[in-house]
Amino acid sequence: MSKCIVFDRDGTLIKYVPYLKDPKQVELLPFVKEVIRAFKNKGYKLFLHTNQSSISKGLFSIEDVKLCNNRLIELLDLEFEIFNEICIAEDYDDITGYRKPSPKFGKEILQKHSIIPENLVYIGDSILDIQTGLNLNCKVFGVKTGIDLRKFENHFFYTKYFYNDLVQIKNRIIQK
């Protein structure tokens, strides 16, 4: 049976930059490349889910976000396809239903890839990421690399697994 991991982007895989629209500002967080490689080598399907409401506010375009996503993939510099799918939630008012903490994208992954919730992992740096995973009844991991750290620590009870970086999360997931 397939196993899947959904990653948040900003603050989880790349350094948080407010209103990121310039691919030159995309910077991988430590160990991201090694962690992605390890999960792919273990057969995990990987997905990216990012809230980008600034698109609907007119601050930047969907193309800007796609260019930043492409830069992330370029920086990973891996010899295989990294993400099975990428979801960009661009609506501030969630017209499409994809804005976190909505479980819509995760439910589509479960259905499309014949996954059970127990084989889906959601990893992020914010309360919205954790709530999204909880709404999916899947495994949830918080990483202390984003800007929501203080809020996140106040809500540590939202997840059983809360770690300093992605390496600690990878070790916890792969050891099972």
For the regions a protein language model found, what residue spans apply to each?
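Metal-dependent phosphoesterase signature
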Residues: 10-30, 55-63, 78-80, 91, ...
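Substrate-recognition element of Asp-dependent hydrolases with the DxDx(T/V) motif
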Residues: 32, 36-69, 83-94
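Short, electropositive alpha-helical surface patch
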Residues: 58-74, 98-110
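Structural recognition of alpha->loop->beta junctions
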Residues: 69-88, 152-173
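Acidic, Mg2+-coordinating phosphoryl-transfer loop and its flanking beta/alpha structural elements
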Residues: 122-158
